[in-house]
């Protein structure tokens, strides 16, 4: 868990997302580090030091005018220093009813974990669980 650029996002959304996600993962983690002032790559360092097979980082995203509390999730197979963004899967705008729901985000996280384990990779090599999934019109913010 990392506050990233929005501690408010972590405060509001991390626990509900964990509650929705952990039951979907066959062997959930036994250690959840909490990092202040972190950026996405911190998961590579932590995962490498812990000899983790995979990391799932929940991090506060850069606040926008309409979403000061958006949570992001980054999933990386075989974390180590030097991983690139192309080697991670990102799920963004996790905000309950105002963005991606906890349930949908949890299912996407579980999908990416299962696929990463099956294929021994993450990032652009993995496909989205449902490429047709979009937010309802009422949840979209028109430009």
Which residues fall in each region the model found?
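Short glycine-rich or small-residue beta-strand-to-loop segments that form or flank ligand, phosphate
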Residues: 1-9, 56-58
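Short, well-ordered, mixed-charge alpha-helical segments that flank or form enzyme active sites
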Residues: 7-10, 38-44, 64-67
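Glycine-rich phosphate/diphosphate-binding loop of Rossmann-like nucleotide-binding domains
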Residues: 7-28
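Short, solvent-exposed amphipathic alpha-helical segments in soluble enzyme
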Residues: 14-19, 49, 72-76
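Active-site rim loops that border cofactor/substrate pockets in soluble metabolic enzymes
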Residues: 22-50
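Structural motif
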Residues: 30-33, 53-57, 73, 88-90
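Glycine-rich phosphate-binding loop
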Residues: 44-72
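C-terminal functional extensions of proteins
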Residues: 61-143
